[in-house]
């Protein structure tokens, strides 16, 4: 078994993308490979086969390996619930909400969870491909580090350092990061990968020669900028859209500060018949066919934010004119009459008045619901699959008109009597083409043909592996993975 780690000089240097690419590159060679990220901080998560949750980037990397996501692939997940605190999830289950100081003290416990998960993966797979977090050169985070060099030192693995040249300063990033590492950590860095290069490689070669001479480390390759790559973004919302023509549905997503699982909207962003707009602070909700209230990690505070922005009035005006309104997870809870948080799971204990558009009330409970589900929409009976991640339990007469019937015998969500408002706990519902078709027809699109989102993601993973094959030093990479030839 070999462990190889990818670390980055900055956030968004390309760590997730490179790990995804290397996982598929190895899997295409018949190598049993698994992804691993010791500690992730993200509000976008995926439900695993063993009933927990991990960062969505690791779920995509699992797909690149041909595996079902497992909690061991991301043993520690931090989901921010305020500017200074986060819900701490270990082995797929929430253990506590902590501020930064409390989590720093907890890191020794988290470290054991990380090492236990790594050991289990190492016993099952030929290669464990590890993704670091942020940068290994953050001086203030070095103590008890479990995300970057602290992990690499603990398991004694080599490291590839990746940097993004598109933003500029790539040589300063690489040399500066290396200089801030200890001698033993510097020795772990086996080479560099430069990401997102545009232009004539011949003009870059003198700089590469200098970098190798100055550091004594090889450049393992230069990856070109890949246009129209649409793998799920882990942090910032990706609002890039391909050029679109013909009849299109206007969809507006109201974005609160603690939005979660904004990847729900990637299929709409890429849909050729949808104009998608994300509405942020200080912006008015534009005229739209469909308004969506997304998931939230802090539903009551995000509902207050919605009202502060004047969006409640805009939503009611939208409905008066016949528009459609969809609430997903936390958005469903906002549509009801009342949201109660007696345990203070998402802030101070208390309750808030909802929008009153569905006849339901929600109470947040300690045990989070985590499951992958299949079923059929009330709209056209369209088949749908997705996942649930929520602490709230909703009750009320509105549930007598469910939005979905699930294969496990349960019903989910609610559809208003006038058919204008639909709420569901199901994330990922736009990824099912038939369900996406039905929802867009409900919202007013007459002729619709939704693309296969899973096929689009698979295509992009293959494109990444092709880049590794064409532009990186395959022999050196195989040697770093402990593979011959």
Curated annotation (Swiss-Prot):
SUPFAM superfamilies for the chain: Class I glutamine amidotransferase-like, P-loop containing nucleoside triphosphate hydrolases
GO BP terms in the entry: cobalamin biosynthetic process
Pathways involved: Cofactor biosynthesis; adenosylcobalamin biosynthesis
Domain GATase cobBQ-type positions: 248-435
Keyword tRNA-binding part of the UniProt annotation: no
Coiled-coil stretches noted in the UniProt entry, renumbered to this chain: none
Active site per the UniProt annotation: 329, 427
Family: Belongs to the CobB/CobQ family. CobQ subfamily.
Name of the protein: Cobyric acid synthase
Organism of this sequence: Azotobacter vinelandii (strain DJ / ATCC BAA-1303)
């Amino acid at each position: 078994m070999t462990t190889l780690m990818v670390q980055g000089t900055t956030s968004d240097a390309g760590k997730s993308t490179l790990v995804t690419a290397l996982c598929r590159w190895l899997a295409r060679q018949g190598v049993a490979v698994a992804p691993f990220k010791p500690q992730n901080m993200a509000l976008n998560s995926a439900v695993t086969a063993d009933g927990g949750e991990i960062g969505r980037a690791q779920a995509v990397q699992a797909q690149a390996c041909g595996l079902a996501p497992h909690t061991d692939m991301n043993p520690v997940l931090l989901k921010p619930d305020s500017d200074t605190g986060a819900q701490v999830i270990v082995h797929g289950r929430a253990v506590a909400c902590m501020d930064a100081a409390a989590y720093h003290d907890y890191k020794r416990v988290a470290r054991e969870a990380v090492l236990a998960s790594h050991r289990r993966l190492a016993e099952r797979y030929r290669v464990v491909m590890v993704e670091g977090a942020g940068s290994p050169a953050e001086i203030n985070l070095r103590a008890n580090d479990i995300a970057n060099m602290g992990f690499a030192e603990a398991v004694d693995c080599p490291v590839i350092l990746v940097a993004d040249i598109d933003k500029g300063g790539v040589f300063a990033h690489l040399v500066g990061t290396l200089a801030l590492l200890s001698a033993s950590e510097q020795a772990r860095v086996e080479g560099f990968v430069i990401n997102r290069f545009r232009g004539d490689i011949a003009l870059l070669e003198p700089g590469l020669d200098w970098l190798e001479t100055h550091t004594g480390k090889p450049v393992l390759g230069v990856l070109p900028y890949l246009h129209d790559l649409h793998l799920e973004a882990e942090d910032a919302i990706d609002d890039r859209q391909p050029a679109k023509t013909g009849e299109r549905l206007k969809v507006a997503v109201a974005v609160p500060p603690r939005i979660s699982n904004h990847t729900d909207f990637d299929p709409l962003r890429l849909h050729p018949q949808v104009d998608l707009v994300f509405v942020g602070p200080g912006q008015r909700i534009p005229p739209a066919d469909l308004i969506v209230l997304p998931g939230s990690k802090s539903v009551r505070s995000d509902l207050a934010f919605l009202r502060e922005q004047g969006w409640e009035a805009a939503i009611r005006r939208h409905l008066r004119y016949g528009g459609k309104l969809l609430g997903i997870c936390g958005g469903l809870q906002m549509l009801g009459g009342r949201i109660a948080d007696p345990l203070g799971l998402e802030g101070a204990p208390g309750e808030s008045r909802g929008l009153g558009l569905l006849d339901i009330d929600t109470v947040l409970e300690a045990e989070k619901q985590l499951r992958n589900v299949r079923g059929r929409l009330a709209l056209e009976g369209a088949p749908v699959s997705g996942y649930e991640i929520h602490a709230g339990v909703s009750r009320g007469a509105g549930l007598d008109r469910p939005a979905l019937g699930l294969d496990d015998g349960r019903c989910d969500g609610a559809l208003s009597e006038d058919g204008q408002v639909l709420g569901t706990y199901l994330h990922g519902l736009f990824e099912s083409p038939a369900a996406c078709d039905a929802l867009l027809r409900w919202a007013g699109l007459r002729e619709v043909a939704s693309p296969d989102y899973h096929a689009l993601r698979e295509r992009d993973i293959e494109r990444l592996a092709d880049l590794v094959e064409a532009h990186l030093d395959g022999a050196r990479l195989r040697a770093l993975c402990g593979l011959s030839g």
